[in-house]
Amino acid sequence: MKINNLILLFFIGLVPLQSINAAEYRLGLSMHDVERRIEGGAAISLEKIFDRPNWWHPYAGRPHIGTHLSTANNTHLLYAGSTWNLFQKGKFSGELAFGAAIHSGQEDIKKDQLGFGCRVNFREMIAFGYQIRKDQLLQVSAQHMSNGSLCDPNQGLTSVGIRFAWKIN
């Protein structure tokens, strides 16, 4: 799946969510594939986290949709899921996210190439943040995408980086 298709899917995915108020946007820069270093370079991420709609289960966190784009044109992700606040202590906070990701990488493991087993995988993220202003947050985050051994063997993809978040409403 080419990067243009992933970007198009990201914006198409936002259309049905327009009725949900946006809580915040996040822009990030991360080291891509820190675990195996088969795919090097940086990745840029863009994420939109929504306020929890009335019909959303109260324990399901806040819905999010985002993309993770490799600057070296390796594996790109389009993902969606839920984000939970773990703690808020003064200006410090923590959060956890879980959902699904569609990737542009290979499914089979090959020499010098990551393989992810199936096209759609699980995606988890943990982040710790510092509130710069009332509507701005700086986070250190780590995300991992893997199929959880539900399909063919996979190597997973782990990225670590920083994100800037700003609240809209």
Predicted regions and their residues:
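Cleavable N-terminal export/targeting peptides
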Residues: 1-23, 169
